[in-house]
């Protein structure tokens, strides 16, 4: 189930009421008619970080490369015309020089050197910085669910 529902730019966001795996979060999001959040702009990322990070810690977002390793996409299927979340220069050593940008031409929020593929195919947002990292999908975290 969900808690802490908030609205930004015409979309509603809710946080799961418990920490869970990425797959469990995806099932709940789908059952509720939503999806794990797709972050389209720096403003949205900053807002999500401010609203959800302090009380709940690191939280799952929709970023993943489950279907194809090194090809990051969003849970709702969008790819943003840039191989999802990176600028196509990712390799087995991660994306240390990724300069992929949002629609507002501001560099995406991957933490430096991330995603680094150290056993992680699911993305989460860091509670302190709002940057993203990849980690094993079997970890337990709260999840941010987005509704159109």
Residue ranges and their predicted role:
Residues 1-148:
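Extracellular, disulfide-bonded carbohydrate-recognition/adhesion ectodomains
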């Amino acid at each position: 189930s969900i808690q802490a529902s908030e609205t930004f730019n015409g979309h509603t966001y809710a946080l799961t009421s418990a920490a869970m795996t990425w797959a469990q979060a995806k099932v709940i999001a789908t059952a509720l008619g939503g999806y794990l959040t797709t972050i389209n702009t720096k403003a949205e990322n900053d807002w999500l970080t401010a609203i959800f990070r302090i009380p709940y810690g690191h939280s799952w977002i929709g970023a993943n490369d489950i279907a194809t390793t090194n090809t990051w996409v969003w849970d709702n299927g969008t790819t943003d015309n840039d191989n999802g979340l990176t600028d196509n220069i990712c390799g087995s050593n991660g994306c240390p020089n990724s300069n992929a940008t949002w629609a507002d031409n501001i560099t995406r929020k991957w933490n430096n050197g991330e995603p680094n593929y150290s056993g992680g195919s699911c993305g989460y947002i860091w509670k302190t910085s709002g940057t993203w990292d990849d980690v094993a999908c079997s970890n337990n975290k709260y999840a941010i669910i987005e509704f159109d």
